Amino acid sequence: MRVKICGITQPQQSVAIASLGATALGFICVPSSPRYVTAGQIRDAVTPLPENIDKIGVFANSSIAEIYQTVIDSGLTGVQLHGDETPEFCDQVRQSLPQVEVLKALRVRSLEHLEQAVIYTKYINTLLLDAYHPQQLGGTGQTLDWQMLQKFRPSCPWLLAGGLTPENILEALSQLNPDGIDLSSGVELKPGDKDLDKVALLFEKLESREWKKGSGE
């Protein structure tokens, strides 16, 4: 299962979090966010990382040109679109950056939003479902209605986000079977400053789950 830790701002934390077990790191490319980092800061953070770690930039309502330039300047391997981007826009990003994973984040508060998510699947590589908040795009600490997602079976891989923590991750995964999970505020001391003890605890919980599955419990 993919494990993405989002909102990285410190290069030394990116290396530590990857070594703890993260398969993907997320970098916020939205200037209004308290977790915002520049292309240069992203490059400093991703340069020492192993090649197999996905480096994903999070954008919201940016232009194709801005996204393209940031990817080229920073060394990102993925682009997460977290604003009001249309399926057609997602397709344009994928065409302009064919070697880069395109993720579309959708803030879900009803079954209608889930139906909308299906429309995106043929234009992107991966879906990300986040909790709805009227003012904030992500990192809100709010959880999704997991029960609503139990029958969600998109045709592309999907990540579960929204208020996940080391304390509730096993409960979430007992109800749902996403291809990956995405955590931000649930493993932070403050925005952009990750709590490495919480990250370590997250992976302890995930490893205990894998052990139980492997032992048939």
UniProtKB/Swiss-Prot annotation:
UniProt KW Transmembrane helix keyword: no
Pathways involved: Amino-acid biosynthesis; L-tryptophan biosynthesis; L-tryptophan from chorismate: step 3/5
Catalytic activity: N-(5-phospho-beta-D-ribosyl)anthranilate = 1-(2-carboxyphenylamino)-1-deoxy-D-ribulose 5-phosphate
Transmembrane segment boundaries: none
Gene Ontology terms: biological process: L-tryptophan biosynthetic process
GO MF annotation list: phosphoribosylanthranilate isomerase activity
UniProt KW keywords: Amino-acid biosynthesis, Aromatic amino acid biosynthesis, Isomerase, Tryptophan biosynthesis
SUPFAM superfamilies: Ribulose-phoshate binding barrel (SSF51366)
Keyword Amino-acid biosynthesis: yes
Known EC number: 5.3.1.24
Family: Belongs to the TrpF family.
Protein name: N-(5'-phosphoribosyl)anthranilate isomerase
